[in-house]
Curated annotation (Swiss-Prot):
Keywords linked to the UniProt accession: 4Fe-4S, Cytoplasm, Iron, Iron-sulfur, Metal-binding, S-adenosyl-L-methionine, Transferase, tRNA processing
One term under GO cellular component: cytosol
Protein name: tRNA-2-methylthio-N(6)-dimethylallyladenosine synthase
Described purpose of this protein according to its UniProt entry: Catalyzes the methylthiolation of N6-(dimethylallyl)adenosine (i(6)A), leading to the formation of 2-methylthio-N6-(dimethylallyl)adenosine (ms(2)i(6)A) at position 37 in tRNAs that read codons beginning with uridine.
Residues reported in the UniProt entry to bind [4Fe-4S] cluster 1: 12, 48, 80
Length: 444
């Protein structure tokens, strides 16, 4: 008899991928996804520790699930908060049955079997054998017209504001053949866009027949798989932009001319305190090389304002860098200390009102740049990836550009031919957060 599995997942692209992996892992032992926690025999909360108050969000969610779950339902906490909190989850929420960190997800079937005998199970180890090596991916969970494929996990950079090295562990690159097999499984099910993901994705150094491959070479190989029409990758670190990656952007037409390249600050003094391992000038050189590799290149980034010790001069240098690059879109946040990170122990914490004022100024500039970029799309013809019929509203369908912009497309008669494929679209209007266009023809 099939039992119900309800997964509630927060956070980054890797968590989306991990949730699909867990669904695939539990299917062979008799669990299938359900849409309501009330109907589940397992409720799994897949957590993220990047943003502020992540733990409070978890315990609030657990309290809600405790009230509505079935009496015999197994309650599981997975992900980065599980890794960081460990046994403390059981102390604050004794009704939780399983705590499992990101590197122990492949042990879920075993933990669930054990919990029926021993009530509580925990696995927050960083194993010698990676979860990528411990399981064989079988992508039964539908990835859709666009799907994530994890190629790298963990981080060795140890930025002083970041919990990732402590919750995801050291950098590990997945075997090339396993990646290619997963991409083939996805394209066989109709996926058109492959998004290669990792905490530090351009640090990828997998192996293929005894030889080491970097991300640029992997992209070239993925592009040869039948059915792949667009390739993206995220998230990148400025220190790991290798020559082969610039070459891939120059030569590989299926690779989107868009890179998410976090910089965090434009001040060298703050970049040193953050342990970012690059200067503002080095970041700008990477940007220049990317733009030289493809005339259509655009970038997005992440920024933290109010890092300990940030002066008004430091912040002005960040604004100067933003003006110099001209980002297509970006994400900006006020610094908030993460327990266990060096930054949490720094003196010279910036007052909240100063953080708020700087964030407003930075977001104002980034918003202006985003609108300018979207307006620059007017009159262009581009290939747009359109999802399934659920993306249709009245006389419009919705798609994603090669720059990840949402596009509202006037739907012609016979628009059912547009779904789950690449469509040729003329952009008529650029708005703040989206584009508007009209279908010309299918791209393929």
């Amino acid at each position: 008899m099939t039992r119900g599995l309800y997964i509630e997942s927060y956070g980054c692209q890797m968590n989306v991928y991990d949730a699909l992996m867990m669904e695939d892992l539990l299917r062979p032992v008799g669990y299938a996804a359900v849409s309501r926690p009330e109907d589940a025999d397992i409720i799994l909360i897949n957590t993220c520790h990047i943003r502020e108050k992540a733990s409070e969000k978890l315990y609030s969610t657990l309290g809600r699930m405790r009230v509505i779950k079935k009496e015999e339902c197994i309650l599981i906490v997975a992900g980065c908060v599980a890794q960081a909190e460990g046994e403390a989850v059981f102390e604050r929420a004794p009704y939780v049955n399983v705590v499992v960190g990101p590197q122990g997800l492949h042990t879920l079937p075993e933990l669930i079997m054990k919990v029926k005998r021993d009530k509580k199970q925990i696995n927050i180890e960083f194993p010698v054998v990676s979860k990528f090596d411990a399981i064989s991916i079988d992508r039964k969970a539908n990835g859709g017209v666009s799907a994530y494929v994890s190629i790298q996990e963990g981080c060795d950079k140890f930025c002083t504001f970041c919990v990732v090295p402590y919750t995801r562990g050291p950098e590990y690159s997945r075997d090339v053949e396993a990646i290619l097999e997963e991409v083939k499984q996805l394209t066989d099910r109709g996926t058109k866009e492959i998004v290669l993901i990792g905490q530090n994705v351009n640090a990828y150094h997998g192996t293929y027949k005894g030889n080491e491959w970097d991300l640029g070479k992997l992209i070239q190989k993925v592009s040869l798989i039948d059915g792949v029409e667009r390739i993206r990758y995220t998230t990148s670190h400025p220190r790991d932009m290798h020559p082969s990656l610039y070459e891939a952007h120059r030569d590989e037409k299926k690779l989107a001319p868009f890179v998410h390249l976090p910089v965090q600050s434009g001040s060298d003094a703050i970049l040193r305190k953050m342990n970012r391992k690059h200067t503002a000038e080095e970041y700008l050189r990477v940007v220049e090389q990317l733009k030289d590799s493809n005339k259509n290149m655009a970038l997005s980034s992440d920024f933290i304002v109010g890092f300990p010790g940030e002066t008004e001069k430091d912040f002005e240098e960040t604004m100067k860098l933003v003006e110099s690059v001209g980002f297509a879109l970006s994400y900006s946040f006020k610094y908030s200390p993460r327990p266990g990170t060096p930054g949490a122990e720094y003196s010279n914490q910036v007052p909240e009102e100063e953080k708020s004022a700087r964030l407003a100024a930075l977001q104002g500039l980034l918003t202006k740049q985003q609108l300018q970029f979207n307006k620059s799309m007017e009159g262009r013809v581009m290939d747009v990836l359109v999802g399934d019929p659920s993306s249709m509203r009245s006389d419009r369908i919705f798609g994603k550009s090669e720059y990840t912009q949402s596009i509202h497309i006037s739907a012609p008669s016979g628009s059912e031919d547009c779904f789950n494929r690449m469509v040729r679209v003329e952009i008529l209007h650029g708005r703040q957060n989206s584009l508007e266009g009209t279908v010309l023809s299918n791209a393929n």
